[in-house]
Amino acid sequence: MKRNSNRKPNEICINRKAKYSFSIKETFEAGIVLLGWEVKSVRCGKINISNSYISLKNGEMYLVNSQFDPISKSNLYITYECNRIKKILLRKREITYLYSKLYKSHLTIIVLSIFFKKQWCKVKIGIAKGKTIKDKREHKKLSEWKKTQNRFVKRIRH
């Protein structure tokens, strides 16, 4: 089976929609508070972060709109909240820096990927600005041009 070349071995989920819809200015690595069944679903890859973003409440950051599907609903005593708001673990100075970017510069904070670093589940977040339709078209043209260039180079080599 062929491996996905742009995916690192420890990355569980990548938000591919983010690079198309946003221009990413900076990236950060942060911890995330998860329950036991959520960690199991992350390890199995049953998560969706395509529409998720980071919000700020009472000086703390939270992951909103992410969906963690449970592996099995065999436990009758636990109610699984798939769209639960999860706390993001950052240092105080990082939170103040992100707060200033969020409200003063009118940027958004989005989730780029979820991965494991040793045994800890981490989130890669990015400060991003939304692209206009014109920017999206230019991005699409550029990516298609790079693909055709690579095809020509392959033909010349062989």
From Swiss-Prot:
Q: Which GO CC annotations does the UniProt entry carry?
A: cytosol
Per the record, the domain of life is Bacteria
**Might you name a Gene Ontology BP term for this protein?**
trans-translation
What GO molecular function terms would the record report? RNA binding
- What subcellular compartments does it reside in? Cytoplasm
Quote the InterPro entries the UniProt record gives. Answer: SmpB, SsrA-bd_prot, SsrA-bd_prot_CS
Primary site of residence: cytoplasm
Q: Which Pfam families match?
A: SmpB
Family, as annotated = Belongs to the SmpB family.
Task: Spell out the NCBIfam families in the cross-references.
Answer: PRK05422.1, smpB
Stated role: Required for rescue of stalled ribosomes mediated by trans-translation. Binds to transfer-messenger RNA (tmRNA), required for stable association of tmRNA with ribosomes. tmRNA and SmpB together mimic tRNA shape, replacing the anticodon stem-loop with SmpB. tmRNA is encoded by the ssrA gene; the 2 termini fold to resemble tRNA(Ala) and it encodes a 'tag peptide', a short internal open reading frame. During trans-translation Ala-aminoacylated tmRNA acts like a tRNA, entering the A-site of stalled ribosomes, displacing the stalled mRNA.
What name has this protein been given in UniProt? SsrA-binding protein
The gene it comes from is smpB
